[in-house]
Amino acid sequence: FAYDALGGDGSDCNGHGTGVAGIAAGSVHGVAKGATIWSVRVFPCSGTSTLSTILAGVDWVTAHHKSPAIANLSLGAAAAPILDTAVERSIRSGVTYVSAGGNNGGDACAMSPGKLKDVINVGATDATDSRTSWSNYGSCISMFAPGVNVAAPDYYSDVSLANWNGTSMAAPMVSGAVALYLQV
């Protein structure tokens, strides 16, 4: 199941989405094993997207979700009111949003959509359960989850894992927990 806001087939071309999906709901190592996943691709292979493409993905989720639904946004943007408005509209339609808190070591309240009060915004901890030096922080972080050396499906292999770092990997742990809670 995939929607590609870039007009492609939804395939992951760098492994980020594969890792995120595997952490949230992978059949072997996922938090919510077996939960239904829809790939909503908003980043090209270069890794840099546009706000309009991200908005297209959020709007697609809003229009096509089946409740209960969780949208994991392992992405971030500088404060963008138009993105915040789209996510708020999606939340009102019944989608729970989990967002990566950011990897800049700064105030998470400067990032969209994680700064929204109804978004579960996730920072990253290390092996000692301490906030990493690079994880964003502040009153807009809802909670922390492991974000260092997180084992996730390896994009280049059907049988091995790769270790990932970042709030992008912490967020799907929380998304998986929310899926278990909501029984998605």
Locate the predicted segments by residue.
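Solvent-exposed loop/turn segments at secondary-structure junctions
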Residues: A5-G7, V28-G30, F43-T48, L75-P81, ...
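Catalytic-core regions built around general acid/base machinery
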Residues: P81-Y97, S112
